């Protein structure tokens, strides 16, 4: 599919469309897709940068997140070693596994 009829195109973070260089981010963003409008020549970043040049916020990530982002963060608590996780814990495990599979 050709991108010619579209006014905006996407490029990765390695391709710089700005005239001034920024330092790399301190943390890896969830997305590294920025938008460049070829008609106006404006570059819209999905990250907010501080005065020191470091990115401190990725606009695609939420401010508040669930405490169980990773499978290893879920604690089983004190239980017998042969006891299986309950329904809520299984649900959290599956959710964390799905979330980690896209990274």
Question: What positions do the PLM features span?
Answer:
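Catalytic toxin/effector domains delivered as secreted proteins or via bacterial secretion systems
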Residues: 2-103
